[in-house]
């Protein structure tokens, strides 16, 4: 398969800092979208992975799964986006797309195993998948979201991990006007949970052991 060299920031060992490196990205196939990365959020799991805190990092590791960028190429069968559109990529870039879970749009429960944006097994090139701390990425259109261009694109990036992590249970439990939602902790996810739940019309209660969080919680609604 043809590839293109792109610049990235990654690490070759748990005790090494992030350094600039050159990585390969595949050329687009029929259902692929190539994205020029404009913004990539920093999730704490990026740090855990780079340091091999969980014990299963495959090096080289290029973190980043909160990706926002501009579509630069599309495959012949792509229908969701066009060149020039703003696109987002979250934590997954592949799955079998044929099992019961995938057919229900629950690819995170893929019965044969989903592929993470980084640290997974690259089915096209072999080796580990390499994430968004890079100039470009190529992803199957099924795992790409169209992002409205009028949004603050830097602020959109964290929604692709922390945002969807809190949005998913709110949607699953059909939270809306009259619902009551409890949020434990006011960190990166907690503040999003409060804003999203309030936006859906719920009554929200925050549980925190830190008195200093009260002012922030009230400011969030």
Give the positions of each predicted feature.
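Short structural boundary motif marking the start of a folded domain
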Residues: 2-9
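Glycine-rich beta-strand-centered segment in the early N-terminal region that forms part
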Residues: 26-40, 53-103, 108, 129-130, ...
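Mid-domain Rossmann-like dinucleotide-binding core that forms the NAD(H)/NADP(H) cofactor-binding site
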Residues: 135, 142, 149-221
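Cytochrome P450 core scaffold surrounding the K-helix E-X-X-R motif
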Residues: 45-51
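Cofactor-binding loop segments of dinucleotide-utilizing enzymes, especially the Rossmann-like FAD-
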Residues: 13, 38-40, 186, 209
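Cysteine-cluster motifs in flexible loop/terminal segments that predominantly coordinate metals
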Residues: 43, 91-142
């Amino acid at each position: 398969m043809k590839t293109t060299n792109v610049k990235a920031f990654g690490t070759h060992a748990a005790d090494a800092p992030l350094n600039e490196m050159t990585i390969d990205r595949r050329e687009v196939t029929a259902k692929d979208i190539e994205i020029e990365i404009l913004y990539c959020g920093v999730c704490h799991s990026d740090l855990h992975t780079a340091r091999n805190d969980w014990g299963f990092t495959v090096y080289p590791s290029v973190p980043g799964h909160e990706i926002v960028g501009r579509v630069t190429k599309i495959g012949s069968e792509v229908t969701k986006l066009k060149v020039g559109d703003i696109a987002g990529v979250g934590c997954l870039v592949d799955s079998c797309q044929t099992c019961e879970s995938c057919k229900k749009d629950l690819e995170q429960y893929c019965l044969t195993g989903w592929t993470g944006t980084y640290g997974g097994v690259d089915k096209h090139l072999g080796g580990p998948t390499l994430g968004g701390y890079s100039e470009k990425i190529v992803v199957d259109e099924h795992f790409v979201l169209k992002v409205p261009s009028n949004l603050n694109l830097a602020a959109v990036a964290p929604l692709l991990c922390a945002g969807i992590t809190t949005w998913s249970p709110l949607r699953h439990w059909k939270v809306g006007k009259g619902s009551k939602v409890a949020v434990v902790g006011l960190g990166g996810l907690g503040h999003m949970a409060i804003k999203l739940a309030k936006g859906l019309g719920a009554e929200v209660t925050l549980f925190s052991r830190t008195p200093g969080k009260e002012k922030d919680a009230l400011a969030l609604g």
